[in-house]
Each structure stands twice: as structure tokens, then as C-alpha cells.
């Protein structure tokens, strides 16, 4: 689930944070383009299914991230 999609759906960062069950300040610590996986299912429920949590998206993100680390010039 993309953060931009969640923000567009809920309309404000405050409402997104409330739906995710977090403080607004915690929302600013979300890194990357994806909603943290632990919050994605909650947002799916809060949106009545309009937003979708897809575990495959998160699995692919992790695979890509790991592959990038292995290609780092400091690794052999």
C-alpha cells in the first residue's frame, strides 16, 4: 500500500494517523513509499477495503532491498 494512496484516501495526515492508530509524529517517521506493513492491514479495514494490503508488494520490496545491499561496493 502506497503512502500517497492512503493519504489521498483519508484526506489529511492527521486522519491517516488516526486510522492507522498512531500519533501524527509517528507518521513522519515512515520511510520509503510504502505504508509500514504492520499498519497496512489496519488501514485496509479502516477504509472498508478501498485500500488494499498486498503481502506480495512487501515481499517484492524486501527482495529488491536485499538485492541492492548485496550489490553494494563494500560487499564481496
Curated annotation (Swiss-Prot):
Write out the entry's keywords from A to Z.
Answer: Cell cycle, Cell division, DNA-binding, Repressor, Transcription, Transcription regulation
Q: Does the keyword Transcription apply?
A: yes
SUPFAM superfamilies cross-referenced by the UniProt entry = lambda repressor-like DNA-binding domains
Cite the InterPro entries for this sequence: Lambda_DNA-bd_dom_sf
User: What molecular functions are annotated in GO for this chain?
Assistant: DNA binding
Q: Which GO terms describe its biological process?
A: cell division; regulation of DNA-templated transcription
The Swiss-Prot or TrEMBL record marks DNA binding at 13-33
> Its biological function?
This protein is a repressor of division inhibition gene dicB.
NCBIfam families according to UniProt: PRK09744.1
Please identify the protein, giving its name as recorded: Repressor protein of division inhibition gene dicB
Query: Per the UniProt entry, what species is this protein from, by scientific name?
Result: Escherichia coli (strain K12)
